[in-house]
């Protein structure tokens, strides 16, 4: 819950990255005007929607939901061209661009349902100390070679991650 609250306080450091035209962005900094926030509470969740405007032509909607009883949160980013002209290309979208600094990190998961010879659904656990690790599917089928569900554990903690998007992910 504390980490979610910290994320929501500083949009310029929000862990998403993307390009608009030739310009790379990490978070929603000075080129993004915050248009407003809404908060919706239910018995089990708290959803904050933040709307931004980029150069009068692209609206970005960031929907973040906290599930406090499960110590979990999620977010989705939407880009909409609201101008009268074509917008610059939006590319290289990383929906979660996060750097972990932790002692003895291990990544666990299972191989997906294709690709590796006769190894579908095989569990793996690897020490990722000192690695820059990029995992992606290779075809457009979300579960090809690796399932997009991971357990990350380190000395004193851990987390589950899921890439909730069909098709290409990285």
Segments (PLM) and residue ranges:
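Polysaccharide-binding surfaces and accessory modules of carbohydrate-active proteins
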Residues: 1-54, 58-170
